[in-house]
A protein has these predicted regions:
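Short, well-ordered alpha-helices that flank and scaffold nucleotide-derived cofactor binding pockets
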Residues: 48, 77, 104, 108, ...
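Conserved small/polar residues in nucleotide/adenosyl-binding loops
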Residues: 269-276
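Carboxylate- and glycine-rich phosphate/diphosphate-binding segment that chelates Mg2+/Mn2+
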Residues: 147-253
Length: 280
């Protein structure tokens, strides 16, 4: 028997960030990273949409690239103090990954990080909150996956947490959020998406459900990544879709040795290195 899991709702297309105003709840905590969403005005838009939905909103800002165990614990503590019924994570892979782990510690304060490092060993989530993810880069696809990557810097180990429980309930894949991406970031996140799709296609767990997604993503990356790199906005929108398709594929077919090697090697270099190494 095999399992195929995706978010309940995936909204895509320019301007779909507005779907936040249709979420049903009382309190939302919005988890973001280093400030690009604030500078570009998307953070304010998201806050206003959530308030339009009738929710009280609290921010948790400053999630670093390659988020640490310490950041996860701080975020979970903030969630326990605020009591949200929606966790909304917006940004690159780091704030979304961090928020997924925060979610587990928010709902289960007594669980240990070591417990969560055991693949597919998460407790049943959604006891207190649901999860919405909004990517601002076109590579990680964590908005549709059952994975979260958290780093224990004291041990020098990057841990991939894996459980279908942390697949978001809602993914908002708004291409407007990636229009201002620097060309270099377009390139390395695009190669990350390509690697996700290829690894899913050659995975020993690939199947008739994952192969079409992987193949479509591969074709789209070849068709649109060069133009996206040069600043073509239609190509950039298509790359945002392609990376999401790749995520749907690899979340269910899983990945292989390429990502295993990248997680180890990138600790020696910059936060960008993992995506670049994935595509080598």
């Amino acid at each position: 028997m095999a399992r195929f899991t995706l978010p309940r709702d995936i909204y895509h297309g320019k301007g779909c960030l507005e779907e936040l105003k249709n979420l049903k709840g009382k309190k939302a905590i919005l988890v973001v990273g280093g400030g690009s969403m604030k500078r570009q005005g998307f953070l304010d838009k998201a806050v206003n949409y959530l308030k339009e939905a009738g929710m009280e909103v609290q921010l948790f800002e400053g999630v670093e690239p390659d988020p640490s165990v310490e950041t996860v614990m701080k975020g979970a503590e903030a969630m326990r103090a605020f009591g949200p019924d929606w966790i909304v994570a917006m940004g690159g892979g780091s704030p979304i990954d961090a928020a997924k782990a925060m979610w587990a510690f928010y709902e289960y304060p007594d669980v240990t990080f070591e417990d969560l490092c055991i693949p597919f060993n998460f407790p049943e989530l959604r006891q207190k909150a649901k999860f919405a993810a909004i990517p601002s880069t076109s590579g990680t696809a964590t908005e549709v996956t059952a994975f979260s990557v958290i780093t224990d810097y004291a041990k020098g180990i990057k841990y991939p947490l894996a459980d279908f429980n942390i697949t978001p309930d809602v993914a908002i894949v708004d291409s407007e959020l990636v229009e201002a991406l620097p060309a270099r970031q377009v390139a390395y996140t695009g190669m990350d998406a390509l690697t996700h799709a290829i690894e899913a296609y050659v995975s020993t767990l690939n199947c008739a459900y994952t192969d079409p997604l992987a193949i479509q993503a591969i074709e789209m990356v070849f068709d649109y990544l060069p133009a996206s790199f040069k600043g073509n906005m239609e190509a950039r929108a298509q790359m945002h879709n392609a990376q999401c398709l790749a995520g749907m594929a690899f979340s269910n077919a899983l990945l292989g040795i390429v990502h295993s090697m990248a997680h180890k090697t990138c600790l020696l270099y910059t936060s960008d290195a993992a995506d670049e190494l994935d595509g080598v």
